[in-house]
Curated annotation (Swiss-Prot):
TM regions (residue ranges): 41-61, 84-104, 122-142, 155-175, 190-210, 492-512
Protein name (record): Glycerophosphoinositol inositolphosphodiesterase GDPD2
Record membrane topology: Multi-pass membrane protein
Intervals, Cytoplasmic compartment: 1-40, 105-121, 176-189, 513-539
Entry keywords, A to Z: Cell membrane, Cytoplasm, Cytoskeleton, Glycoprotein, Hydrolase, Membrane, Metal-binding, Transmembrane, Transmembrane helix
Pfam families per record: GDPD, GDPD_2
Extracellular topological domain: 62-83, 143-154, 211-491
Record-annotated GP-PDE domain positions: 225-480
Gene Ontology terms, MF aspect: glycerophosphoinositol inositolphosphodiesterase activity; metal ion binding
InterPro entries attached to this UniProt entry: GP_PDE_dom, PLC-like_Pdiesterase_TIM-brl
UniProt key word Metal-binding: yes
Subcellular location as annotated: Cell membrane; Cytoplasm; Cytoplasm, Cytoskeleton
Enzyme Commission number(s) from the entry: 3.1.4.43
Length: 539
Protein backbone atom coordinates (compact mmCIF):
# COMPACT_ATOMS: atom_id res chain seq x y z
CA UNK A 1 0.00 0.00 0.00
CA UNK A 2 2.35 2.74 1.15
CA UNK A 3 5.67 2.91 -0.66
CA UNK A 4 7.22 6.22 0.43
CA UNK A 5 8.30 7.68 3.74
CA UNK A 6 5.55 10.31 3.51
CA UNK A 7 5.10 12.72 6.37
CA UNK A 8 7.29 11.99 9.36
CA UNK A 9 5.65 14.48 11.66
CA UNK A 10 5.03 13.85 15.33
CA UNK A 11 1.34 13.40 14.49
CA UNK A 12 2.07 10.60 12.04
CA UNK A 13 4.53 9.02 14.47
CA UNK A 14 1.85 9.02 17.20
CA UNK A 15 -0.62 7.33 14.88
CA UNK A 16 1.97 4.76 13.92
CA UNK A 17 2.76 4.11 17.59
CA UNK A 18 -0.90 3.40 18.37
CA UNK A 19 -1.26 1.09 15.36
CA UNK A 20 2.02 -0.82 15.57
CA UNK A 21 2.99 -0.17 19.23
CA UNK A 22 6.45 0.99 18.06
CA UNK A 23 7.66 4.53 18.66
CA UNK A 24 11.00 4.23 16.90
CA UNK A 25 11.36 5.55 13.37
CA UNK A 26 11.61 2.86 10.70
CA UNK A 27 14.56 2.83 8.31
CA UNK A 28 13.78 3.42 4.67
CA UNK A 29 13.77 -0.22 3.70
CA UNK A 30 11.08 -0.96 6.30
CA UNK A 31 8.82 1.95 5.35
CA UNK A 32 6.89 -0.20 2.91
CA UNK A 33 3.69 -2.10 3.66
CA UNK A 34 4.14 -5.79 2.90
CA UNK A 35 1.55 -8.12 1.40
CA UNK A 36 1.09 -9.65 4.86
CA UNK A 37 0.31 -6.20 6.27
CA UNK A 38 -2.22 -5.68 3.48
CA UNK A 39 -3.92 -8.97 4.40
CA UNK A 40 -4.15 -7.92 8.05
CA UNK A 41 -5.58 -4.56 7.03
CA UNK A 42 -8.19 -6.40 4.97
CA UNK A 43 -9.00 -8.56 8.01
CA UNK A 44 -9.31 -5.38 10.07
CA UNK A 45 -11.82 -3.98 7.60
CA UNK A 46 -13.73 -7.29 7.63
CA UNK A 47 -13.74 -7.28 11.45
CA UNK A 48 -15.12 -3.76 11.45
CA UNK A 49 -17.96 -4.80 9.14
CA UNK A 50 -18.68 -7.92 11.22
CA UNK A 51 -18.79 -6.00 14.50
CA UNK A 52 -20.96 -3.31 12.93
CA UNK A 53 -23.30 -5.99 11.62
CA UNK A 54 -23.42 -7.63 15.04
CA UNK A 55 -24.31 -4.27 16.60
CA UNK A 56 -27.22 -3.99 14.18
CA UNK A 57 -28.31 -7.54 15.03
CA UNK A 58 -28.12 -6.75 18.75
CA UNK A 59 -30.26 -3.64 18.39
CA UNK A 60 -32.89 -5.52 16.39
CA UNK A 61 -32.95 -8.46 18.79
CA UNK A 62 -33.70 -6.16 21.72
CA UNK A 63 -37.35 -6.56 20.73
CA UNK A 64 -37.18 -10.27 21.61
CA UNK A 65 -34.46 -10.30 24.26
CA UNK A 66 -36.97 -11.02 27.04
CA UNK A 67 -37.28 -14.52 25.50
CA UNK A 68 -33.50 -14.92 25.81
CA UNK A 69 -33.60 -13.80 29.46
CA UNK A 70 -36.36 -16.30 30.27
CA UNK A 71 -34.53 -19.06 28.39
CA UNK A 72 -31.39 -18.57 30.48
CA UNK A 73 -33.42 -18.43 33.69
CA UNK A 74 -35.05 -21.77 32.90
CA UNK A 75 -31.66 -23.39 32.36
CA UNK A 76 -29.51 -21.58 34.96
CA UNK A 77 -32.05 -20.64 37.61
CA UNK A 78 -30.62 -17.11 37.91
CA UNK A 79 -32.36 -14.03 36.52
CA UNK A 80 -30.40 -11.36 34.67
CA UNK A 81 -31.44 -8.81 32.07
CA UNK A 82 -28.88 -9.20 29.29
CA UNK A 83 -29.97 -6.13 27.31
CA UNK A 84 -27.39 -3.74 28.74
CA UNK A 85 -24.62 -6.36 28.73
CA UNK A 86 -25.18 -7.26 25.07
CA UNK A 87 -25.21 -3.61 23.99
CA UNK A 88 -22.12 -2.75 26.06
CA UNK A 89 -20.02 -5.65 24.75
CA UNK A 90 -21.01 -5.11 21.12
CA UNK A 91 -20.46 -1.35 21.39
CA UNK A 92 -16.94 -1.95 22.74
CA UNK A 93 -16.15 -4.28 19.83
CA UNK A 94 -17.42 -1.75 17.28
CA UNK A 95 -15.55 1.13 18.94
CA UNK A 96 -12.26 -0.77 19.03
CA UNK A 97 -12.51 -1.96 15.42
CA UNK A 98 -13.59 1.52 14.25
CA UNK A 99 -10.70 3.32 15.96
CA UNK A 100 -8.16 0.80 14.68
CA UNK A 101 -9.54 1.08 11.14
CA UNK A 102 -9.43 4.88 11.37
CA UNK A 103 -5.80 4.72 12.47
CA UNK A 104 -4.97 2.50 9.52
CA UNK A 105 -6.66 4.85 7.04
CA UNK A 106 -4.89 7.90 8.48
CA UNK A 107 -1.54 6.11 8.34
CA UNK A 108 -2.20 5.22 4.72
CA UNK A 109 -2.91 8.86 3.90
CA UNK A 110 0.32 9.88 5.67
CA UNK A 111 2.33 7.32 3.73
CA UNK A 112 3.26 5.39 6.87
CA UNK A 113 3.69 1.59 6.96
CA UNK A 114 0.75 -0.48 8.20
CA UNK A 115 2.66 -2.78 10.56
CA UNK A 116 -0.12 -4.02 12.83
CA UNK A 117 1.08 -5.10 16.28
CA UNK A 118 0.62 -8.72 17.34
CA UNK A 119 -1.66 -7.71 20.22
CA UNK A 120 -4.06 -6.05 17.77
CA UNK A 121 -3.92 -9.14 15.57
CA UNK A 122 -4.89 -11.40 18.47
CA UNK A 123 -7.74 -9.09 19.47
CA UNK A 124 -9.04 -8.96 15.90
CA UNK A 125 -9.07 -12.75 15.69
CA UNK A 126 -10.88 -12.93 19.03
CA UNK A 127 -13.53 -10.49 17.77
CA UNK A 128 -14.03 -12.55 14.61
CA UNK A 129 -14.37 -15.75 16.66
CA UNK A 130 -16.75 -14.06 19.12
CA UNK A 131 -19.01 -12.73 16.36
CA UNK A 132 -18.90 -16.08 14.53
CA UNK A 133 -19.86 -17.91 17.74
CA UNK A 134 -22.74 -15.49 18.25
CA UNK A 135 -24.00 -16.04 14.71
CA UNK A 136 -23.78 -19.82 15.04
CA UNK A 137 -25.58 -19.72 18.40
CA UNK A 138 -28.28 -17.53 16.92
CA UNK A 139 -28.74 -19.93 14.02
CA UNK A 140 -28.95 -22.97 16.29
CA UNK A 141 -31.12 -21.67 19.11
CA UNK A 142 -33.14 -18.78 17.66
CA UNK A 143 -33.28 -19.37 13.93
CA UNK A 144 -36.56 -17.44 13.68
CA UNK A 145 -34.61 -14.28 14.50
CA UNK A 146 -33.15 -14.33 10.98
CA UNK A 147 -36.70 -13.62 9.82
CA UNK A 148 -36.77 -10.72 12.29
CA UNK A 149 -33.58 -9.33 10.79
CA UNK A 150 -34.87 -9.60 7.24
CA UNK A 151 -38.08 -7.91 8.30
CA UNK A 152 -36.16 -5.13 10.03
CA UNK A 153 -34.58 -4.14 6.73
CA UNK A 154 -37.99 -2.95 5.57
CA UNK A 155 -37.81 -0.39 8.38
CA UNK A 156 -34.12 0.51 8.22
CA UNK A 157 -32.93 -0.10 4.63
CA UNK A 158 -33.71 3.42 3.32
CA UNK A 159 -31.50 4.89 6.05
CA UNK A 160 -28.84 2.18 5.84
CA UNK A 161 -28.57 3.00 2.14
CA UNK A 162 -27.80 6.65 2.89
CA UNK A 163 -25.22 5.54 5.47
CA UNK A 164 -23.65 3.13 2.97
CA UNK A 165 -23.41 5.89 0.34
CA UNK A 166 -21.75 8.19 2.89
CA UNK A 167 -19.35 5.42 3.94
CA UNK A 168 -18.28 4.52 0.40
CA UNK A 169 -17.79 8.22 -0.35
CA UNK A 170 -15.52 8.67 2.68
CA UNK A 171 -13.62 5.55 1.68
CA UNK A 172 -12.90 7.07 -1.74
CA UNK A 173 -9.97 9.18 -0.47
CA UNK A 174 -7.80 6.30 0.87
CA UNK A 175 -8.78 4.22 -2.18
CA UNK A 176 -7.74 7.02 -4.53
CA UNK A 177 -4.53 7.49 -2.54
CA UNK A 178 -3.72 3.79 -2.85
CA UNK A 179 -4.62 3.79 -6.55
CA UNK A 180 -2.09 6.53 -7.34
CA UNK A 181 0.60 5.09 -5.08
CA UNK A 182 0.76 1.58 -6.55
CA UNK A 183 2.49 1.19 -9.92
CA UNK A 184 1.62 -2.22 -11.45
CA UNK A 185 -1.32 -1.89 -13.83
CA UNK A 186 -3.01 -5.16 -12.77
CA UNK A 187 -3.57 -4.26 -9.10
CA UNK A 188 -4.64 -0.73 -10.10
CA UNK A 189 -7.34 -2.03 -12.46
CA UNK A 190 -8.49 -4.65 -9.93
CA UNK A 191 -8.78 -2.04 -7.17
CA UNK A 192 -10.71 0.32 -9.42
CA UNK A 193 -13.13 -2.38 -10.62
CA UNK A 194 -13.74 -3.65 -7.09
CA UNK A 195 -14.35 -0.20 -5.62
CA UNK A 196 -16.62 1.12 -8.35
CA UNK A 197 -18.44 -2.23 -8.61
CA UNK A 198 -19.34 -2.07 -4.92
CA UNK A 199 -20.21 1.62 -5.30
CA UNK A 200 -22.56 0.90 -8.20
CA UNK A 201 -24.38 -1.81 -6.23
CA UNK A 202 -24.81 0.58 -3.29
CA UNK A 203 -26.12 3.32 -5.58
CA UNK A 204 -28.73 0.98 -7.08
CA UNK A 205 -29.84 -0.66 -3.80
CA UNK A 206 -33.23 1.17 -3.70
CA UNK A 207 -33.95 -0.17 -7.18
CA UNK A 208 -32.72 -3.71 -6.54
CA UNK A 209 -33.38 -4.55 -2.90
CA UNK A 210 -35.17 -1.87 -0.88
CA UNK A 211 -38.91 -1.99 -0.31
CA UNK A 212 -40.92 -0.84 2.68
CA UNK A 213 -44.62 -0.46 3.45
CA UNK A 214 -43.77 2.89 5.06
CA UNK A 215 -42.89 4.34 1.66
CA UNK A 216 -46.42 5.60 1.11
CA UNK A 217 -48.48 8.76 1.16
CA UNK A 218 -49.94 9.90 4.46
CA UNK A 219 -53.50 9.58 3.17
CA UNK A 220 -52.90 5.87 2.49
CA UNK A 221 -51.75 5.14 6.06
CA UNK A 222 -53.95 2.42 7.65
CA UNK A 223 -55.51 2.93 11.11
CA UNK A 224 -53.26 2.50 14.13
CA UNK A 225 -53.16 -1.14 15.29
CA UNK A 226 -54.95 -2.00 18.50
CA UNK A 227 -52.95 -3.16 21.53
CA UNK A 228 -53.06 -6.55 23.23
CA UNK A 229 -51.31 -6.71 26.60
CA UNK A 230 -48.84 -9.62 26.65
CA UNK A 231 -49.45 -11.16 30.09
CA UNK A 232 -50.94 -7.76 30.83
CA UNK A 233 -48.59 -4.82 31.19
CA UNK A 234 -45.41 -6.60 32.37
CA UNK A 235 -43.31 -3.43 32.37
CA UNK A 236 -45.71 -1.75 34.80
CA UNK A 237 -46.87 -4.63 37.00
CA UNK A 238 -46.12 -8.30 37.76
CA UNK A 239 -47.19 -10.37 34.77
CA UNK A 240 -50.43 -12.38 34.81
CA UNK A 241 -51.84 -10.62 37.89
CA UNK A 242 -54.93 -8.50 38.53
CA UNK A 243 -52.69 -5.45 38.86
CA UNK A 244 -51.31 -6.18 35.40
CA UNK A 245 -54.90 -6.46 34.16
CA UNK A 246 -55.73 -3.00 35.52
CA UNK A 247 -52.56 -1.48 34.04
CA UNK A 248 -53.49 -2.99 30.68
CA UNK A 249 -56.80 -1.14 30.75
CA UNK A 250 -55.01 2.10 31.69
CA UNK A 251 -52.74 1.66 28.65
CA UNK A 252 -55.72 1.76 26.33
CA UNK A 253 -55.34 -1.87 25.29
CA UNK A 254 -58.47 -3.75 24.30
CA UNK A 255 -57.31 -7.30 25.08
CA UNK A 256 -55.47 -8.98 27.95
CA UNK A 257 -53.41 -11.93 26.70
CA UNK A 258 -52.48 -14.51 29.31
CA UNK A 259 -51.56 -18.15 29.95
CA UNK A 260 -53.79 -20.65 31.75
CA UNK A 261 -52.91 -23.86 33.59
CA UNK A 262 -55.08 -26.23 35.61
CA UNK A 263 -54.22 -26.95 39.25
CA UNK A 264 -54.04 -30.47 40.67
CA UNK A 265 -57.61 -30.10 41.96
CA UNK A 266 -59.01 -28.71 38.71
CA UNK A 267 -58.95 -24.91 39.12
CA UNK A 268 -57.73 -23.00 36.01
CA UNK A 269 -55.25 -20.27 37.03
CA UNK A 270 -52.89 -17.81 35.38
CA UNK A 271 -49.27 -18.90 34.93
CA UNK A 272 -46.83 -18.88 32.03
CA UNK A 273 -43.87 -20.95 33.26
CA UNK A 274 -43.84 -24.67 33.95
CA UNK A 275 -42.02 -23.83 37.20
CA UNK A 276 -43.20 -21.27 39.74
CA UNK A 277 -39.72 -20.07 40.72
CA UNK A 278 -39.46 -17.05 38.39
CA UNK A 279 -42.69 -15.25 39.28
CA UNK A 280 -43.52 -16.42 42.83
CA UNK A 281 -41.88 -17.02 46.22
CA UNK A 282 -42.27 -20.79 45.94
CA UNK A 283 -38.62 -21.20 47.03
CA UNK A 284 -39.44 -19.89 50.51
CA UNK A 285 -42.95 -21.36 50.91
CA UNK A 286 -42.35 -24.81 49.36
CA UNK A 287 -38.52 -25.11 49.14
CA UNK A 288 -38.68 -28.87 48.60
CA UNK A 289 -41.01 -28.43 45.57
CA UNK A 290 -39.21 -25.64 43.75
CA UNK A 291 -38.74 -27.85 40.67
CA UNK A 292 -42.29 -29.19 40.64
CA UNK A 293 -44.56 -28.43 37.69
CA UNK A 294 -46.88 -25.48 38.24
CA UNK A 295 -49.93 -27.70 37.64
CA UNK A 296 -48.89 -30.10 40.41
CA UNK A 297 -49.90 -27.60 43.09
CA UNK A 298 -53.43 -27.47 44.48
CA UNK A 299 -55.38 -24.24 44.35
CA UNK A 300 -55.07 -23.83 48.13
CA UNK A 301 -51.29 -24.11 47.83
CA UNK A 302 -51.16 -21.65 44.93
CA UNK A 303 -53.11 -19.10 46.97
CA UNK A 304 -50.37 -19.14 49.61
CA UNK A 305 -47.81 -17.84 47.11
CA UNK A 306 -46.92 -14.21 46.50
CA UNK A 307 -46.82 -13.26 42.80
CA UNK A 308 -45.53 -9.69 43.08
CA UNK A 309 -42.43 -9.31 45.26
CA UNK A 310 -40.18 -10.81 42.57
CA UNK A 311 -41.12 -7.90 40.29
CA UNK A 312 -39.77 -5.40 42.82
CA UNK A 313 -36.58 -7.38 43.43
CA UNK A 314 -35.62 -7.88 39.77
CA UNK A 315 -37.29 -5.68 37.16
CA UNK A 316 -37.74 -7.98 34.13
CA UNK A 317 -37.36 -5.20 31.54
CA UNK A 318 -34.38 -2.87 31.37
CA UNK A 319 -35.38 0.79 31.23
CA UNK A 320 -38.88 0.26 32.62
CA UNK A 321 -40.27 3.09 34.73
CA UNK A 322 -39.95 2.70 38.51
CA UNK A 323 -43.18 2.13 40.39
CA UNK A 324 -44.73 4.79 42.59
CA UNK A 325 -45.26 4.16 46.29
CA UNK A 326 -48.88 3.06 45.90
CA UNK A 327 -48.03 0.81 42.95
CA UNK A 328 -45.18 -0.80 44.89
CA UNK A 329 -47.52 -1.59 47.75
CA UNK A 330 -50.08 -3.05 45.35
CA UNK A 331 -47.41 -5.14 43.60
CA UNK A 332 -46.21 -6.55 46.93
CA UNK A 333 -49.67 -7.98 47.61
CA UNK A 334 -50.31 -9.67 44.26
CA UNK A 335 -51.32 -13.32 44.23
CA UNK A 336 -51.95 -15.87 41.49
CA UNK A 337 -55.43 -15.23 40.05
CA UNK A 338 -57.93 -17.89 39.08
CA UNK A 339 -59.24 -17.66 35.53
CA UNK A 340 -62.81 -17.14 36.75
CA UNK A 341 -61.71 -14.25 38.96
CA UNK A 342 -59.80 -12.68 36.08
CA UNK A 343 -62.79 -12.88 33.73
CA UNK A 344 -65.03 -11.05 36.18
CA UNK A 345 -62.46 -8.29 36.70
CA UNK A 346 -61.87 -7.99 32.94
CA UNK A 347 -65.60 -7.64 32.31
CA UNK A 348 -65.72 -4.77 34.81
CA UNK A 349 -62.84 -3.07 32.96
CA UNK A 350 -64.39 -3.75 29.53
CA UNK A 351 -61.39 -5.86 28.46
CA UNK A 352 -61.43 -8.97 26.30
CA UNK A 353 -59.37 -12.00 27.31
CA UNK A 354 -57.20 -14.15 25.04
CA UNK A 355 -55.23 -17.02 26.51
CA UNK A 356 -52.92 -19.92 25.74
CA UNK A 357 -54.01 -23.11 27.49
CA UNK A 358 -51.14 -25.28 28.68
CA UNK A 359 -51.62 -29.05 28.97
CA UNK A 360 -50.67 -30.43 32.41
CA UNK A 361 -48.14 -33.28 32.86
CA UNK A 362 -49.17 -36.77 31.75
CA UNK A 363 -49.73 -38.02 35.32
CA UNK A 364 -52.05 -35.10 36.09
CA UNK A 365 -55.66 -35.79 37.11
CA UNK A 366 -56.99 -33.50 34.38
CA UNK A 367 -54.53 -34.41 31.65
CA UNK A 368 -57.35 -35.46 29.28
CA UNK A 369 -60.04 -33.04 30.49
CA UNK A 370 -58.09 -29.80 31.03
CA UNK A 371 -59.96 -28.13 28.13
CA UNK A 372 -63.35 -28.95 29.66
CA UNK A 373 -62.20 -27.73 33.07
CA UNK A 374 -61.16 -24.43 31.54
CA UNK A 375 -64.36 -24.08 29.55
CA UNK A 376 -66.42 -24.75 32.69
CA UNK A 377 -64.57 -21.95 34.47
CA UNK A 378 -65.31 -19.56 31.60
CA UNK A 379 -69.01 -20.44 31.58
CA UNK A 380 -69.22 -20.27 35.39
CA UNK A 381 -67.92 -16.70 35.38
CA UNK A 382 -71.23 -15.53 33.87
CA UNK A 383 -69.54 -13.02 31.57
CA UNK A 384 -70.26 -12.35 27.93
CA UNK A 385 -68.87 -15.14 25.77
CA UNK A 386 -67.92 -12.56 23.16
CA UNK A 387 -65.26 -11.11 25.47
CA UNK A 388 -63.33 -14.41 25.40
CA UNK A 389 -60.96 -14.97 22.48
CA UNK A 390 -60.40 -18.74 22.43
CA UNK A 391 -56.93 -19.61 21.12
CA UNK A 392 -56.32 -23.31 22.04
CA UNK A 393 -56.74 -25.80 19.18
CA UNK A 394 -57.50 -28.76 21.45
CA UNK A 395 -61.16 -29.86 21.30
CA UNK A 396 -62.12 -26.65 19.52
CA UNK A 397 -65.27 -28.15 17.95
CA UNK A 398 -66.66 -29.04 21.39
CA UNK A 399 -65.86 -25.55 22.67
CA UNK A 400 -67.69 -23.95 19.75
CA UNK A 401 -70.70 -26.15 20.33
CA UNK A 402 -70.96 -25.30 24.04
CA UNK A 403 -69.99 -21.62 23.71
CA UNK A 404 -71.03 -20.54 20.20
CA UNK A 405 -70.63 -16.81 20.84
CA UNK A 406 -67.03 -17.17 21.95
CA UNK A 407 -64.64 -15.71 19.37
CA UNK A 408 -62.28 -18.30 17.88
CA UNK A 409 -58.67 -17.22 17.31
CA UNK A 410 -56.37 -19.30 15.10
CA UNK A 411 -52.64 -19.40 15.60
CA UNK A 412 -51.85 -20.53 12.05
CA UNK A 413 -52.84 -19.83 8.48
CA UNK A 414 -54.80 -22.57 6.77
CA UNK A 415 -55.05 -25.97 8.39
CA UNK A 416 -58.09 -27.76 9.78
CA UNK A 417 -60.41 -24.88 10.54
CA UNK A 418 -63.78 -25.77 12.03
CA UNK A 419 -65.22 -22.54 10.64
CA UNK A 420 -64.21 -19.59 8.54
CA UNK A 421 -61.80 -17.73 10.86
CA UNK A 422 -62.32 -14.14 11.85
CA UNK A 423 -59.04 -13.67 13.72
CA UNK A 424 -55.45 -14.81 13.19
CA UNK A 425 -52.84 -14.64 15.94
CA UNK A 426 -49.36 -15.06 14.43
CA UNK A 427 -45.72 -14.19 15.20
CA UNK A 428 -44.66 -10.90 13.64
CA UNK A 429 -41.98 -12.75 11.65
CA UNK A 430 -44.82 -14.10 9.47
CA UNK A 431 -45.61 -10.66 8.07
CA UNK A 432 -43.81 -11.16 4.70
CA UNK A 433 -45.90 -14.29 4.06
CA UNK A 434 -49.21 -12.53 4.78
CA UNK A 435 -51.39 -10.75 2.26
CA UNK A 436 -52.99 -8.31 4.67
CA UNK A 437 -55.25 -6.72 2.05
CA UNK A 438 -56.60 -10.08 0.91
CA UNK A 439 -57.24 -11.13 4.52
CA UNK A 440 -59.13 -7.90 5.17
CA UNK A 441 -61.22 -8.49 2.06
CA UNK A 442 -62.19 -11.84 3.61
CA UNK A 443 -63.03 -10.03 6.90
CA UNK A 444 -60.14 -11.68 8.73
CA UNK A 445 -58.36 -9.60 11.38
CA UNK A 446 -54.65 -10.14 12.03
CA UNK A 447 -52.87 -9.86 15.38
CA UNK A 448 -49.07 -10.22 15.46
CA UNK A 449 -46.90 -10.92 18.52
CA UNK A 450 -44.72 -9.91 20.39
CA UNK A 451 -44.05 -6.29 19.37
CA UNK A 452 -42.17 -4.07 21.84
CA UNK A 453 -40.08 -1.58 19.87
CA UNK A 454 -41.44 1.52 18.10
CA UNK A 455 -39.63 0.70 14.84
CA UNK A 456 -41.40 -2.66 14.59
CA UNK A 457 -44.76 -1.23 15.61
CA UNK A 458 -44.36 1.47 12.95
CA UNK A 459 -43.61 -1.12 10.28
CA UNK A 460 -46.66 -3.22 11.18
CA UNK A 461 -48.78 -0.08 11.30
CA UNK A 462 -47.77 0.79 7.74
CA UNK A 463 -48.45 -2.81 6.68
CA UNK A 464 -52.06 -2.57 7.88
CA UNK A 465 -51.96 -5.05 10.78
CA UNK A 466 -55.10 -4.84 12.95
CA UNK A 467 -53.48 -5.32 16.36
CA UNK A 468 -50.25 -6.33 18.06
CA UNK A 469 -49.46 -8.16 21.28
CA UNK A 470 -46.94 -6.15 23.29
CA UNK A 471 -45.05 -5.93 26.57
CA UNK A 472 -44.81 -2.14 26.16
CA UNK A 473 -48.39 -0.95 25.85
CA UNK A 474 -47.54 2.26 27.73
CA UNK A 475 -44.92 3.11 25.08
CA UNK A 476 -46.88 2.19 21.96
CA UNK A 477 -49.99 3.92 23.29
CA UNK A 478 -48.20 7.28 23.03
CA UNK A 479 -47.32 6.91 19.34
CA UNK A 480 -49.56 9.09 17.18
CA UNK A 481 -47.79 8.28 13.89
CA UNK A 482 -45.21 5.78 12.61
CA UNK A 483 -41.60 6.75 13.27
CA UNK A 484 -41.21 7.61 9.60
CA UNK A 485 -43.37 7.84 6.52
CA UNK A 486 -42.05 8.85 3.09
CA UNK A 487 -44.12 9.47 -0.04
CA UNK A 488 -42.63 7.52 -2.99
CA UNK A 489 -41.76 10.68 -4.94
CA UNK A 490 -39.97 12.21 -1.96
CA UNK A 491 -37.98 9.03 -1.37
CA UNK A 492 -37.02 8.93 -5.06
CA UNK A 493 -35.79 12.52 -4.80
CA UNK A 494 -33.71 11.72 -1.68
CA UNK A 495 -32.22 8.68 -3.43
CA UNK A 496 -31.25 10.60 -6.58
CA UNK A 497 -29.81 13.58 -4.68
CA UNK A 498 -27.78 11.31 -2.38
CA UNK A 499 -26.30 9.32 -5.26
CA UNK A 500 -25.57 12.41 -7.38
CA UNK A 501 -23.84 14.18 -4.49
CA UNK A 502 -21.74 11.08 -3.86
CA UNK A 503 -20.78 10.78 -7.54
CA UNK A 504 -19.62 14.41 -7.64
CA UNK A 505 -17.56 13.94 -4.49
CA UNK A 506 -16.02 10.70 -5.80
CA UNK A 507 -14.96 12.34 -9.06
CA UNK A 508 -13.59 15.36 -7.21
CA UNK A 509 -11.58 13.17 -4.84
CA UNK A 510 -10.02 11.09 -7.63
CA UNK A 511 -9.26 14.18 -9.74
CA UNK A 512 -7.76 16.03 -6.78
CA UNK A 513 -5.66 13.05 -5.71
CA UNK A 514 -4.56 12.50 -9.30
CA UNK A 515 -3.42 16.12 -9.54
CA UNK A 516 -1.46 15.78 -6.30
CA UNK A 517 0.19 12.58 -7.55
CA UNK A 518 1.15 14.27 -10.82
CA UNK A 519 2.73 17.23 -9.00
CA UNK A 520 4.64 14.84 -6.74
CA UNK A 521 6.00 12.95 -9.74
CA UNK A 522 7.00 16.21 -11.44
CA UNK A 523 8.72 17.42 -8.27
CA UNK A 524 10.53 14.10 -7.91
CA UNK A 525 11.71 14.18 -11.54
CA UNK A 526 12.92 17.78 -11.08
CA UNK A 527 14.81 16.84 -7.93
CA UNK A 528 16.46 13.90 -9.71
CA UNK A 529 17.43 16.14 -12.65
CA UNK A 530 18.93 18.80 -10.35
CA UNK A 531 20.87 16.10 -8.51
CA UNK A 532 22.34 14.83 -11.77
CA UNK A 533 23.25 18.39 -12.83
CA UNK A 534 24.96 19.03 -9.49
CA UNK A 535 26.86 15.77 -9.72
CA UNK A 536 27.95 16.59 -13.27
CA UNK A 537 29.02 20.11 -12.26
CA UNK A 538 31.00 18.83 -9.31
CA UNK A 539 32.93 16.49 -11.56
Amino acid sequence: MADSPGCCSIWARCLHCLYSCHWRKYPKQKMQTSKCDCIWFGLLFLTFLLSLGWLYIGLILLNDLHNFNEFLFRHWGHWMDWSLIVLLVVSLLVTYASLLLLLGLLLQLCGQPLHLHSLHKVLLLLIVLLVAAGLVGLDIQWRQEWHSLRLSLQATAPFLHIGAVAGITLLAWPVADTFYRIHPRGPKVLLLLLFFGVTLVIYLMPLLFISSPCIMKLRDLPPKPGLVGHRGAPMLAPENTLMSLRKTAECGAAVFETDVMVSSDGVPFLMHDERLSRTTNVASVFPERISAHSSDFSWAELQRLNAGTWFLERQPFWGAKKLSGSDRKEAENQTIPALEELLKEAAALNLSIMFDLRRPPRNHTYYDTFVNQTLEAVLSANVSQAMVLWLPDEDRANVQQRAPRMRQIYGHQGGNWTERPQFLNLPYQDLPALDIKALHQDNISVNLFVVNKPWLFSLLWCAGVDSVTTNACQLLQQMQNPLWLLPPQKYLMIWVITDCASILLLLSIFLLRGGCAKRNRTGLETAVLLTKINNFASE
